[in-house]
Amino acid sequence: MNTVNIRPLPGERRVNYSAGWFVPVDEVTGMPPALPLRVFLDIHDGQGWVPTGIEPAITLSGAITYPGLGRCHNPAAAAPTRYRARFESEAYLAVGRAHQDGEEFLAYPFDGTTPPAVAASRVTVSLAPAVGYPFPGHLPVLYGQVSTAAGEPVPDVLVSATVGPPVLRTPQTAQTLTGPGGAFALPLRWAPAGPAITVTATDYRHVPNRTGQLSVQLPGALGRNQQIVIR
């Protein structure tokens, strides 16, 4: 159970439970994000999502939490509340956006003596690099755009490339997401020069899913803006 102690009165100890527990990870570095990341919390009012304006608490390890969500006077008579955390940044794109706008979770009712019926689960939020990410100079990055056959740019499309045997003994996969204008930046740190690499774009938000592929070779493909059409 994730707990956070906040401002107890003298001689008292007040325990709060965190309904949300998110650990953001920069997929380029494998570390907590070093660049600015904004988090917005929405509540579902039965009709749709409404911004709450509630700011998260950040733990010493960099986890994003929402202590106090679900606290009420009579937990036995209260129902869980549905929330959603959205992650936005100029440098990052939350990979989960390939499927939905944010990470949804339930805040179960609790008070000072009754804990939530269900403990919060730790959720890793993978942050793929956006086009504006400051990549190190030695890292090969494939830039491009995903669009429909009609030329309309498509945001929130998962772009990935996998290379395995016989080129690489252990299969490696790189992934990123398209931004609002359909543009993407796909880092390929393990990709060898010469062999063809297949880059796949998948729009999971469209029903049915739309996909497109592109075959590239390094290093020649790095100096061009690649175009992937999904159908």
Question: What are these language model-derived features?
Answer:
Residues 1-33, 111-141, 145-152, 221-231:
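Beta-strand-rich domain onsets/edges
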Residues 13-15, 76-80, 135-137, 177-179, ...:
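Surface-exposed coil/turn segments at beta-strand junctions on protein surfaces, enriched
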Residues 19, 36-38, 82, 141, ...:
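Exposed beta-strand and adjacent loop surfaces of beta-rich binding modules
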Residues 29-47, 149-167:
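Short, ordered, surface-exposed loop/turn motifs in non-cytosolic proteins
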Residues 43-71, 167-186:
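Short, acidic Ser/Thr/Gly-rich low-complexity loop/linker segments typical of extracellular
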Residues 75-96, 193-206:
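A short, solvent-exposed beta-strand micro-motif common in secreted/extracellular proteins
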Residues 91-123, 203-227:
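Structured interaction patches on ligand/partner-binding surfaces of diverse proteins
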Residues 155-231:
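Structured core of small recognition/catalytic domains
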